[in-house]
Amino acid sequence: IYSHDSYNAPDYTNSIKWNRKLEYKEVFEYYKALIRLRKGSPLFRMNTKEDVNAHLHFMHNDDWNCVSWKLEKDGECYVIALNPYYENRGFGLPEGSFYLRLDESGKMNKQPVSGSFVCPPLSAVVYKRIKNI
């Protein structure tokens, strides 16, 4: 039963349905990967407007309905892209080599990529710049 404002609803409505963890395992694993990503970099934990303004930069896209941005600080750089379309869309990358840190299924791919990448339909991806050693 769904309730828009369930603060005073019975436990049945507000209880955690633990069996759904198995039913929606892909979603559970994706959320775990998002939490791991957030914990892994202070760039995903900025909590002031000044920090966000200093380290977030929107990137140019030929398609105005697609959006991508760069988070960069102290040599660490991430590119995040959102594709709202039902087909693949291409995005550009800043200078350097990147790897796919998080795809639409929560997976990572350490294969280096540079110049551009393709974002799958109806998804978000996160790329991380490979640090030069």
Where do the language-model regions lie?
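Conserved active-site loop/cleft motifs that coordinate metal ions or position small ligands
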Residues: 79-82, 100-101, 128
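A broad, structure-centric signal for solvent-exposed, well-ordered loop/edge residues
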Residues: 23, 88, 108-109, 126
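Solvent-exposed beta-hairpin/edge-strand motifs
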Residues: 94-107
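Loop/helix patches that line or flank the sugar-binding groove of alpha-linked glycan CAZymes
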Residues: 1-96
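C-terminal beta-strand-rich structural cap/linker in extracellular carbohydrate-active enzymes
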Residues: 110-133
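Short, glycine-/Ser/Thr-/acidic-enriched flexible segments
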Residues: 74, 84-87, 105, 124, ...
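A broadly tuned, weak detector of single residues within folded domains
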Residues: 27, 99-102, 115
